């Protein structure tokens, strides 16, 4: 990590208002309560049909409802916390419009995005690619961001955990290889906000992180992504257990990349009343003295990307799919990891999931 030897503490901020059109969710407690948060990622920017048709979630960025957000961003940044924007996410279309060989089309969609990032002085952009996308299109976007914003602008990606392992389904399309992207543009990518939840991984032990390290990833570039509240998705890990996992990862990997949380507004244990408590607890675990690891916990030798299969001992990822759907795919000869990942990719459709697995 170029700017600090300390692990990152990243929090996503998508639900910008309390439920039922309530008041804005304030970011200021993250800095007034000494949480040690290092990065806030505002989500989600969508590049919609028609050049210049950009929304922050469902509304124009300059909508009155966002005034508090833009005002608080300045205070958060003044405290030393970097504030980034998330592009894409579950709502598809942003990357499709920025992809393809038509340069004029790319420019027409990219320029308004660039102007928005400049207007609000974001410190970086997180690319959450949850739709089929090409590597050349992503490389072009990364190169253009670097050219327009300079060397200090943070460029991150948000893959699911399976995307960093060989031969596993993920959300960015069968032709998209994050390991190849890292080889091509790793020098421009600050880190990966890796999703260890919603059936794509497991954060209750170090096993999935260890597996990613074993196929050649650098620990300083892999941030372990966590669900902050079970209402936000499957795979939530209770606080004290998560803190124990973090301590083990820091002992195993002195350059551990840190943790991120999805998302801020209802993070436990404080919930909607005190959501900053999650960050404060994670911050203590990330800043506490590092225990000395036993010899058998030292990192295995790094192998070239793609060598070896996913370790068979990986704990199953938590998910919400019917057991019968998973078993159907297992009967066809696929592992539980593959079955859950394919169901995630196809919205739970067993037939489409089987087709995806056989295609791979």
What are these regions (language model features)?
Residues 214, 244-252, 328-332, 345:
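Short basic/hydrophobic patches in alpha-helices and adjacent helix-turn junctions
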Residues 243-247, 257-260, 270-311:
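C-terminal accessory extensions appended to soluble enzyme cores
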Residues 129, 258-261, 341-342:
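Surface-exposed patches in mature extracellular/periplasmic domains of secreted proteins
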Residues 2-243, 253-256, 265-282, 289:
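Chitinase-like catalytic core of GlcNAc-active glycosidases
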């Amino acid at each position: 990590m170029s700017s600090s030897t300390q692990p990152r503490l990243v929090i996503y901020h998508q639900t910008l208002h309390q439920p039922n059109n309530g008041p804005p969710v304030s970011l200021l407690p993250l800095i007034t309560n000494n949480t040690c948060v290092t990065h806030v990622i505002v989500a989600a920017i969508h590049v919609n049909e028609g050049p210049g048709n950009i929304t922050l979630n469902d509304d124009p960025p300059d909508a009155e409802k966002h005034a508090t957000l833009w005002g608080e961003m300045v205070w958060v940044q003044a405290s030393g916390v970097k504030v980034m924007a998330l592009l894409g996410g579950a709502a598809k279309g942003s990357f499709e419009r920025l992809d393809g060989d038509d340069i004029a089309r790319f420019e027409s969609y990219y320029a308004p995005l660039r102007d928005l990032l400049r207007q609000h002085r974001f410190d970086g952009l997180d690319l959450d690619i949850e739709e089929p996308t090409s590597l050349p299109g992503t490389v072009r976007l990364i190169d253009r961001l670097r050219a327009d914003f300079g060397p200090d602008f943070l460029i991150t990606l948000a893959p699911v955990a399976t995307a960093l392992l060989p031969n596993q389904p993920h959300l960015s399309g069968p032709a998209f290889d994050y390991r190849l992207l890292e080889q091509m543009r790793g020098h421009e990518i600050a880190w990966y906000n890796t999703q260890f939840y919603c059936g794509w991984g497991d954060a209750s032990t170090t096993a999935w992180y260890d597996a990613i390290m074993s196929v050649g990833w650098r620990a300083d570039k892999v941030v372990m992504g966590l669900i902050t509240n079970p209402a936000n998705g499957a795979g939530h890990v209770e606080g004290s257990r998560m803190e124990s996992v973090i301590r083990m990862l820091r002992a195993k990997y002195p350059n551990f990349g840190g943790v991120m949380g999805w998302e801020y507004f209802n993070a436990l244990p404080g919930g909607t009343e005190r959501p900053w408590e999650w960050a404060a607890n994670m911050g203590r675990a990330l800043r506490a003295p590092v225990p000395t690891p036993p010899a058998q916990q030292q990192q295995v030798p790094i192998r070239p990307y793609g060598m070896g299969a996913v370790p068979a001992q990986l704990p199953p990822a938590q998910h919400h799919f019917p057991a019968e759907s998973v078993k159907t795919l297992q009967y066809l000869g696929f592992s539980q990891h593959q079955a859950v990942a394919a169901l995630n990719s196809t919205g739970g459709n067993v037939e489409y999931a089987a087709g995806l697995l056989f295609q791979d």
